[in-house]
Each structure stands twice: as C-alpha cells, then as structure tokens.
Design a protein with these regions (language model features):
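Interfacial/gating helices of multi-pass transporter permease domains
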Residues: 43-65, 132-136, 196-197, 238-245, ...
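Short alpha-helical transmembrane segments in multi-pass integral membrane proteins
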Residues: 1-24, 82-149, 191-247, 304-369, ...
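Small-residue-rich hydrophobic transmembrane alpha-helices
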Residues: 54-114, 151-170, 264, 278-336, ...
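N-terminal transmembrane alpha-helices
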Residues: 9-49, 62-77, 81, 106-113, ...
C-alpha cells in the first residue's frame, strides 16, 4: 500500500475499503487464536503429564490476559487517536502518539515482568492451582513473563499499522508469529524434550520475531506515521487522551481474568472437574465468536475514525452500518451452528466421552445468547472509533463487571442445578448488555455526528 490508501479512506468505496481492511484483520485474529489452540493441543498430548500440564498452563491464563490488557491500553487507545489526527491532517501529532504509546509499552514491560515473575506461585495458588498443576503453571508463566516486552510491542503497536490502512502488513505480523509458533512448538516440546518450558520458549521466540517485524515497518520508508526516537519523550497532552480511550479495551480484556477465576471457582464447587474442563472448551469456542468480531471492527475503526476526524459524516454512517450488519450476521449464523451441532464443537477440543457429553449440554446454555453479541460488540467498539472514551468504558463494564460476574454468584441461589445456573449467567448478561448498548449507541449516534460538524 501507499499514502494513497490514506486518501482513499476519505473518498473510496466504503464497502470495498471495509473488505480490504476487515478481511486481513479477521484472518489475523483467527491466526492469533491458533496460538492458544495449537499450544493447548500440543501440551495436552505430552506423554504422561499432558492433562496436568494443560491444566497448569490454563491457570496462567488470567495473567496472560492482564498482559494483553495493558497492551490494549496503549494500542487500542492510541490507534484511534492517531487516525483522528490523520483525518484532521495533523501528521506531527499522530507520530507523537505512536512514539508515546511505544514508550508506555516499554515501561509497562519492565513493571509487569518484575511484578508477575515474583508473585506467580502465589497467584496461581489463588486461581486454584494444586501441588500437581502449580509447577507447570510457574514453569510456563515465568518464561512467558520474561518475554512480555515482545508480547506488549506486538499487541500494542500492530494497531498503528492497521489504522494507517496497511491491513495486509498488520495481518502478516500475526501470520509470521503464528506460523513460527506452530513450527517451533513440536520441536521444543517433543524433539528437544522440553515439555511445557518448550511451549513457552516457542511462544516468546515467535512474538520476538513479530515485534522486530513491526518495528522495522514503523521505522521504515513505507509507513505513513514513522516511529521516531525524538517523539518518545512522554507528553501528558499526547499520551493521556490515548490512555483514557484505551481504558475501555483494558477493562474489556482485564476483566476476563476476573471472569475466568469466577467461572472456574464456582464450577469447581458445583460441578467438579468435568464442569471446569467443559468451561475450558467453552472459553475456546467463545473465542471463535469474539475474536473475528474484533477483527471486523478493527477493519471498520480506521474508516469511522478517519472520516469522523475529516467530518465526512455520511461516510461515518455507512462505515458503521456496514460493520454492524456483518457483526450481527456472523453471530447469528454461529448461534444457529452451536444450537444444532453442539457435539461437533465439543469434539474439536476433546475426545473424552464424558467431557464431550457434558460440554455438548453446557454449550447450548452458555452460548444461548450468542446472536446478541454482534449488537453489543459493534456498537461498543464504534463508540471507541468515535473517540467517546467514557461511554465506551461504561459499555465495556456493563456486561462483565455489572452483569456477568455478579450473576455467576447470584443465579445459583435460585436454581437446584447450580452448575446450570453458572452457565446461564453468560447468555443472560449477553442479551441484557446488547440491548442496553444498542439503544444507547443509536440514541447518541446522531448527537455525536452533529457534534463532529461543529
């Protein structure tokens, strides 16, 4: 791509641009999903220790989510701000945003590595780790934490490539890392006989290569916004609005940690190991829904943000509705597939007959509200694209903090089958959050567009 791509966002066909930018983003999200899925498959097949090792690595998931959340704080907050600045023709400010966010990511890597490396055993115990699973969680987690700088750079800086219109380059970042991880996993785990440690090393190495790829692009000739050392000194007026906007994504991702612990602790109490195992599968299936949605909205975000900054309001409307209907259509189709083919989805992740039976039952409950997720995600992320940090944050908090997590603990008091009640919390919160978010967005949409004209 070239600088003409940036100009096309203000004049080219909205639908064509959505396809050009959303498809690579969706592919990137799906490939990114393979990181977790492939790791779980390989680790779960380590002779003799596969089950315990897989459980141990799963216990590290809340910390992994927190690291991701901090990356999103800078990346998801800074990229829309940079796009808005580009739309206004203020390239200097946009480049300062890129550099300031990079500085924040480097500082976060130092802090997070220090905190999590030392406290990892204690945290895993709090998450439910046992004497059997704790060693695997700590072994995997400490290696991953030592390489967190690469994870933060990849997840935090890649959005700045997408927001410039280089969706294909952004996708390659993920493809390169995923392919390297898929190749290195069996080599380090089985050939070098390093087990769980090998899986962690493979992941860190793949992220390191992706990080180098990103930095070479952002400091090269093809990029529109160049990462420059002179812009890396933090400026409050530059970085604070980015972090304010990124809080919404930070909350969305970080609350997954709390959510994970809430589900597993409750299901362990009411349903035992098979319920916790089913939850692991359900989480993976749920990612098949949410991650492509994130990709679709990543494709729509630059179009919405750029044209909002350029005050081309009809194009903002067209871009949003294109994003909205694709998201709703995708979740509706997935919802129907889950209802009619629950055992197929369960069987993808496990061959254990008892676990397949239980998961097939649970998946119809847990994902009963999937059709509504497209409404909630597309509207909530559109608020972000329009620079509405406060409203986006409220909508992000609504589903998980205000509805889902409390319902996990409240609903079992009203049902004889308490495990059923825990699973039921998911669709109830999905539908309620979608209704509130959609009504709120369409109520404010016209006001937001009018404000952009002033």
């Amino acid at each position: 791509m070239s600088k003409e791509t940036n100009q096309d966002m203000g004049t080219g066909s909205v639908k064509k641009l959505m396809v050009q930018m959303a498809v690579p983003a969706v592919v990137g999200q799906v490939i990114n999903l393979l990181y977790n899925v492939v790791d779980r498959i390989y680790i779960g097949h380590i002779p003799e220790i596969g089950g315990a090792a897989l459980t141990g690595v799963g216990l590290f998931t809340p910390i992994l989510m927190l690291i991701t959340a901090f990356a999103m704080l800078a990346g998801a907050g800074g990229a829309p701000r940079a796009a808005i600045a580009m739309g206004k023709g203020d390239r200097d400010t946009a480049e300062k945003i890129v550099a300031n966010c990079f500085t924040v990511l480097l500082l976060l890597s130092v802090v997070l590595t220090g905190v999590f490396y030392g406290t990892l055993p204690t945290l895993v115990r709090l998450f439910g780790g046992s004497d059997v699973t704790l060693p695997y969680a700590v072994q995997y987690g400490r290696i991953y934490v030592l390489g967190s700088v690469f994870v933060l750079v990849v997840m935090g800086m890649n959005p700045f490539i997408t927001t410039q219109g280089f969706a294909g380059t952004s996708m390659l970042t993920t493809v390169i890392g995923a392919v390297i991880n898929i190749v290195l996993d069996p080599i380090f785990i089985f050939v070098f006989d390093m087990g769980v440690a090998g899986a962690a090393i493979a992941t860190v190495l793949s992220q390191a290569v992706s990080a180098v790829w990103i930095l070479r692009f952002l400091t090269g000739r093809k990029t529109i916004l160049r990462l420059k050392a002179r812009n890396m000194l933090l400026q409050g007026k530059i970085i604070l609005p980015c972090l304010a906007l990124g809080i919404s994504s930070f909350v969305m991702v970080s609350t997954e940690s709390i959510l994970s612990v809430s589900f597993t602790s409750s299901l362990s109490r009411y349903g035992g190991d098979v319920a916790v195992g089913a939850m692991t599968v359900l989480t993976s299936v749920n990612q098949l829904i949410t991650m492509p949605l994130q990709g679709i909205c990543q494709g729509g975000q630059p179009l919405i943000s750029y044209n909002y900054g350029a005050k081309k309001l009809e194009r903002v409307k067209e871009a949003f509705f294109c994003q909205f209907f694709v998201c709703v259509g995708y979740t509706t189709v997935f919802w129907l597939l889950v209802l009619f083919l629950p055992r197929v989805f369960a069987g993808i992740f496990t061959s254990d007959a008892a676990l397949v039976d239980y998961t097939a039952w649970a998946i119809r409950i847990f994902l009963a509200g999937t059709f509504s997720v497209g409404f909630q995600v597309s509207c909530q992320l559109a608020f972000m694209a329009l620079g509405q940090a406060k409203i986006s944050l409220i909508m992000a908090c609504l589903r998980k903090l205000i509805l889902l997590i409390p319902l996990i603990f409240i609903l079992p008091n009203f049902f004889a089958d308490k495990a059923f009640a825990v699973f039921l919390a998911e669709p109830v919160s999905d539908i309620l959050a979608a209704a509130v978010t959609t009504v709120t967005f369409f109520t404010f949409f016209r006001k937001l567009l009018k404000a952009g004209e002033q």
